[in-house]
């Protein structure tokens, strides 16, 4: 039998810092590259410890893509050990700043939580990846447009839902203060038990503050995140009579067969969970 002597071209590696970014990049580049995330689904990203095998993958990659805004506390050290170019999304984004605790004045890194900012992530990555590979620019552009249309649909559906909510009820109460971009973009007010997960010790003072706010404003539902324990927030719900709406995905996509295996699924799941939390509480 005559052997097929076409040598399959090995795909180059684009290494990214976390799973949400991995999925966004894959949606733009399609099958042109291998795209891999250093942190795996369900992992806490802020305080991740780099492993020797991560450094090996880093040395094989043609680029390292990160969020920035201090999200990947380990990235500076990681990149210092490697001779690899870097794309940092935050260099092209307007930050919202954290306004309390030791993180006061530092940028909140979680911009991707808002569909409106997710569209900006796609635009920034499209531009940077087109510079990296001008030959595939048109293909990337087409992929990016398709992806943005899907995000836009999620954005529009959520806006329509919020229009049905009383202004006084538009509070998003979470464990981590990760939703500033979402609350900012959709005219919601934000409250949380701690500003960033790296600082996830709940103090009696913080707890009391959130409980008082939920009672005073009669906030219908409270939420937590998938990578931390929801125990404290469930106590808030019990104490106030608010509905515990469940866990939202913030720093990581879900593991296989979970509800948020892709960025679009994550947006749909989060916004659907928020919607259901408000709706269920209104029925009670």
Which residues make up each language-model segment?
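Extracytoplasmic metal-acquisition and chelation regions
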Residues: 1-284
């Amino acid at each position: 039998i005559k052997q097929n002597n076409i040598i399959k071209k090995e795909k180059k590696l684009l290494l990214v810092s976390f799973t949400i970014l991995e999925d966004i990049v894959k949606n733009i580049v399609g099958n042109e590259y291998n795209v891999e995330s250093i942190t795996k689904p369900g992992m806490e990203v802020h305080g991740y410890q780099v492993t020797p095998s991560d450094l090996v993958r880093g040395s094989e990659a043609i680029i390292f893509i990160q969020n920035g805004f201090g999200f990947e506390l380990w990235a500076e050290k990681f990149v210092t050990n490697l001779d690899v170019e870097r794309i940092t999304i935050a260099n092209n984004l307007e930050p919202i700043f954290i306004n309390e605790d030791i993180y006061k004045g530092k940028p909140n890194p979680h911009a991707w939580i808002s569909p409106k900012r997710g569209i900006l992530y796609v635009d920034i990555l499209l531009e940077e990846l087109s510079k990296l590979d001008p030959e595939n620019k048109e293909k990337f552009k087409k992929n990016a447009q398709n992806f943005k249309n899907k995000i836009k649909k999620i954005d529009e559906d959520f806006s329509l839902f919020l229009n049905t909510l009383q202004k006084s009820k538009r509070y998003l109460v979470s464990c981590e203060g990760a939703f500033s971009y979402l609350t900012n973009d959709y005219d919601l007010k934000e409250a949380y038990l701690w500003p960033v997960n790296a600082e996830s010790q709940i103090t009696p003072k913080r707890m009391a503050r959130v409980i008082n706010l939920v009672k005073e404003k009669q906030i219908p539902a409270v939420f937590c995140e998938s990578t931390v324990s929801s125990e404290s927030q469930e106590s808030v719900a019990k104490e106030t009579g608010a509905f515990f709406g469940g866990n939202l995905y913030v720093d990581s996509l879900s593991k296989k067969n979970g509800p948020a295996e892709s960025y679009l699924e994550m947006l749909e799941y989060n916004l659907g969970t928020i919607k259901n939390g408000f709706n269920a509480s209104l029925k009670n």
